[in-house]
């Protein structure tokens, strides 16, 4: 896609029902790497809005994407209103186009959408303290609980088979068989690690197929920076970045948060001796999450959360190693073995989780372990 200039941005802004002429800042806003995000505001007001160009190379069906987001946010707003909350602040609000649509296609074929800007909030890029991690957990759990009665099967898959771990395993096997760059001979321990966990990769989907755990509306990208906190109080306000909201398992969202938050190292740490899964942070997050989501979950689903932590971490490592075998085409790299370092970090975390897995189960399901 072409770079977004001020004229392109202003032309897109003019398509939305902002209530008047807009001032547009063509500098990117935030930390996101997929969509192009900008802040715009009305010329005579200080009220701000988010204007985004959707990356249609990643999200090929913007109509389905926005149908998901509109349906989920309308449901959330009704729940928040009924609970006495502030839906204008506690949920993303989609701004329609002047014709009443949820998104706009410009003359270049680019898809755009707009939201109210949620003022006086911050998002964390890393876990600063236990209290913040618990707050993020409570906010994500509340999001899950409020969507517990939403018909998940009506949602579009915005990225097909995104958390289908057996499919990720199959893609790895194809990359290994092709061995396009001849790298397989240098990573025998990592290959053996994945092969030894083929059976594990099926655990969650087997539980879903057997009817032991339910299909849910899931966020599928539950990094801590996708939760807005009140700038003054630190209270959890709103879950953002809803592009990957689609049918899934609660274990996916729980597990991805643990993968990214319950350790004290960078995702691409080259020194594996510095990689440490923090069981205490896992417990902090689990208790926060279950305090708001637990009421709508069965014992079997609670137990699946521990598996979610293991499998989302394993799956991510498989994806990194697959990309390494294929020539580093998907994930951006800053050094030759970057994806290999990423994969090794994930596998170290998996190994450490396996060592304390009984304790992980006990934490999420103390009454039925």
Language-model features, listed with the residues they occupy:
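Juxta-kinase regulatory segment immediately upstream of eukaryotic protein kinase catalytic domains
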Residues: 1-26
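Conserved ATP-binding subdomain of kinase catalytic cores across diverse folds
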Residues: 25-174, 248-250, 261-262, 266-273, ...
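ATP-dependent phospho-/nucleotidyl transfer catalytic cores
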Residues: 27-31, 52-53, 59-63, 118-134, ...
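Active-site activation/catalytic loop segments of kinase-like enzymes and analogous catalytic loops
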Residues: 251-294, 311-330
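Small/polar glycine-rich anion-binding or flexible loop at a beta-alpha turn
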Residues: 302-312
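Long, compositionally biased intrinsically disordered regions
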Residues: 353-356
């Amino acid at each position: 896609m072409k770079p977004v200039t001020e004229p392109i941005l202003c032309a897109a802004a003019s398509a939305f029902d902002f209530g008047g002429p807009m001032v547009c800042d063509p500098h990117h806003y935030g930390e996101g790497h997929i969509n192009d995000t900008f802040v715009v505001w009305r010329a005579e007001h200080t009220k701000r809005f988010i204007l985004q160009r959707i990356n249609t190379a990643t999200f090929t069906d913007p109509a389905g994407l926005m149908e998901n987001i509109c349906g989920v946010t309308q449901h959330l707003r009704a729940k928040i209103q009924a609970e006495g909350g502030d839906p204008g602040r506690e949920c993303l609000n989609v701004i329609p186009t002047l014709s009443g649509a949820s998104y706009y296609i410009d003359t270049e074929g680019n898809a755009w959408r707009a939201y109210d800007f949620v003022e006086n909030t911050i998002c964390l890029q890393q876990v600063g303290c236990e209290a913040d991690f618990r707050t993020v957990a409570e906010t994500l759990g509340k999001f899950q609980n409020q969507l517990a009665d939403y018909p998940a099967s009506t949602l579009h898959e915005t990225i097909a088979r995104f958390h289908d771990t057996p499919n990720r395993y199959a893609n790895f096997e194809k990359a290994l068989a092709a061995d396009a760059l001849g790298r397989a001979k240098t990573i025998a321990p990592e290959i053996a690690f994945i092969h030894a966990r083929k059976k594990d990769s099926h655990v969650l989907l087997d539980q879903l197929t057997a009817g032991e755990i339910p299909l849910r509306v899931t966020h599928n990208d539950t990094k801590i920076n996708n939760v807005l906190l009140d700038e003054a109080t630190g209270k959890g306000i709103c879950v953002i970045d809803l592009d990957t909201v689609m049918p899934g398992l609660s274990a996916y969202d729980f597990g991805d948060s643990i993968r990214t938050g319950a350790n004290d190292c960078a995702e691409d740490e080259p020194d594996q001796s510095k990689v440490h899964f923090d069981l205490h942070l896992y417990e902090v997050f689990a208790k926060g999450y279950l305090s708001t989501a637990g009421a709508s979950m069965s014992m079997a689903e609670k137990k699946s959360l521990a598996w979610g932590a293991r499998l989302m971490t394993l799956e991510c490592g498989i994806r990194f190693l697959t990309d390494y075998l294929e020539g580093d085409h998907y994930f951006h790299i800053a050094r030759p073995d970057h994806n290999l370092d990423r994969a090794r970090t994930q596998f170290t975390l998996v190994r450490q989780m396996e060592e304390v897995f009984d304790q992980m189960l006990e934490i999420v399901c103390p009454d039925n372990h």
